[in-house]
A protein has these predicted regions:
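Active-site neighborhoods and metal-handling regions in enzymes and metal-associated proteins
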Residues: 1-286
């Protein structure tokens, strides 16, 4: 890697200024680059590049829309395989295979990697993204469906809460509360709105419904070149501490989640997730 940097930049006449994404460079790598270009001035360009990535090109949006469509197909395949006695891992494999075949069909000349599914049942749903297991589904289980197609490094997702055969009263009440917050969140996403303002209003709604203390993480985030392996744009998170104003061609999710601890009525994790493309006057739910 360092040899490639030297061959591109040149060592005999090093540039006066070199930009680094400091949030991705380790201390060891920073020291090595500094020793190679000791006369150059280094600047952190991570925030600037992050802001560029937050606004998607039309080509990027097309990839993301195809990803969302393929995520739906993965979810459809998972639902077909949900039945008592089937395991989380086998159901996950079915959804993943459906998505990968569709990615190949849509992008026959691409390179394929990282598409995955998380599918949890029962109390295994209690984390944002718990590992899947060999647990067998039983009637009355709460289920968490999560599909993640990866297309040329572009990440999309579909996440839904389901129940096998029957949802008890407390589980249904919790699910309905989370769905209500999710629907309100979809209405709030539009150009000119601050990320933090969306969160504050949804927090108030959760409090009215009596579930705010069960909320577990942010309400959504940016989409694009990212994954759970290599991060995302921290400046476009739907969190109380992010004051970024939504703009045209930004792409964000709305995904409220509540988690009711084991041993309590309705125990498990509840999450609904949609992706929206910000337009001039509103947002398109893809």
């Amino acid at each position: 890697f360092l040899k490639a940097i030297v061959s591109i930049i040149g060592r005999d006449e090093p540039p006066k200024n070199i930009g680094l994404e400091n949030d991705h460079v380790t201390l060891d790598m920073r020291e090595k680059i500094g020793s190679l270009f000791s006369f150059s001035v280094f600047s952190d360009v991570s925030k600037h590049l992050m802001e560029l990535r937050m606004i998607k090109s039309n080509e990027e949006i097309e990839i993301i829309k195809n990803g969302a469509r393929i995520a739906d197909l993965g979810g459809e395949e998972i639902v077909k395989n949900i039945r008592e006695g089937n395991t989380e891992i086998e159901i996950s494999i079915a959804g993943r295979d459906r998505m990968e075949r569709e990615i190949v069909k849509t992008y026959p000349d691409a390179e394929y990697m990282d598409t995955w599914v998380w599918f949890q049942s029962g109390i295994n749903t209690d984390g944002a993204h718990n590992p899947k297991t060999n647990r067998k589904l039983t009637k009355g289980d709460i289920l968490s469906l999560n599909t993640f197609p990866m297309i040329s490094g572009y990440y999309t997702a579909l996440e839904r809460t389901l129940f096998l055969d029957h949802a008890d009263d407390e589980s249904l009440k919790a699910w309905e509360a989370n769905v209500k917050v999710h629907k309100r969140g979809l209405e709030l996403i539009k150009p000119g709105v601050k990320c933090s303002d969306i969160c504050h209003e949804l927090n108030e709604l959760f409090a009215e419904l009596g579930y705010l203390h069960y909320r577990t993480f942010g309400y959504g985030h940016s989409f694009g070149v990212l994954s759970h392996f290599y991060g995302r744009e921290a400046g476009l998170e739907l969190r109380e501490d992010i004051d970024t104003v939504l703009e045209e061609n930004m792409v964000v999710s709305m995904e409220p989640m509540i988690m009711i601890p084991e041993g309590n009525p309705g125990a498990g994790g509840y999450r609904e997730h949609d992706i929206l493309v910000i337009g001039k006057d509103g947002a398109e739910n893809i």
